[in-house]
């Protein structure tokens, strides 16, 4: 499966390794799931992970981002053509949606699924980490993960 990972899930996955975000991150790091990215997403990951409140080591963050860059799939994204009546709660979420749509991701995994309520019109589903894990397990049991 190919996914876009919202920054909130990446951070939660590093902080709470046994909870659903951590298990999703394990799937990415283990190669069972392919992370889709563009430079804007990796820049946001870097900026957020560097915040002092998380206390992640700079070398660890650099190593993680290098791995995600190498193991993931780079996407050249484009702005979404959204009708005016669609309101995006957080415009900083748009790069994640754009990567998901252009790359035809299987899912955008986020802790804020309601921020991406417009994605189904593009054939993309925003899922919580727990929902994604259920779908991944179902697909794996059918040999499609």
Regions found by a protein language model. Give the residues of each.
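PIN/NYN-family metal-dependent endoribonuclease catalytic core
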Residues: 4-5, 15, 21-52
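A secondary-structure boundary/capping signal
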Residues: 6-7, 37-38, 112, 128
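Short, flexible helix/strand-to-coil boundary loops that buttress conserved ligand/catalytic motifs
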Residues: 14-15, 49, 120, 137
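Residues at secondary-structure transition points
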Residues: 19, 36, 59, 87, ...
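Helix-adjacent hinge/juxtasegments
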Residues: 48, 53-86
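Active-site neighborhoods of divalent-metal-dependent phosphate/nucleic-acid chemistry enzymes
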Residues: 70-107, 113
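Acidic, PIN/NYN-like endoribonuclease modules and their adjacent C-terminal/linker elements
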Residues: 94, 101-107, 113-145
């Amino acid at each position: 499966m190919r996914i876009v990972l919202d920054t909130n899930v990446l951070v939660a996955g590093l902080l709470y390794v046994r909870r659903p975000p951590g298990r999703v991150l394990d799937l990415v790091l283990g190669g069972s799931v392919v992370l889709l990215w563009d430079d804007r997403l990796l820049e946001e990951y870097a900026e957020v992970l560097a915040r002092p409140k998380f206390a992640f080591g700079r070398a660890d963050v650099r190593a993680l981002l290098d791995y995600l860059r190498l193991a993931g799939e780079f996407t050249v994204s484009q702005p979404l053509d959204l009708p005016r009546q669609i309101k995006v709660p957080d415009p900083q979420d748009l790069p994640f949606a754009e990567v998901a749509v252009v790359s035809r991701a299987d899912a955008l995994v986020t802790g804020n699924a309601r921020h991406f309520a417009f994605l189904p019109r593009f054939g993309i589903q925003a899922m919580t980490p727990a929902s994604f894990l259920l779908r991944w397990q179902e697909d794996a049991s059918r040999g499609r993960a």
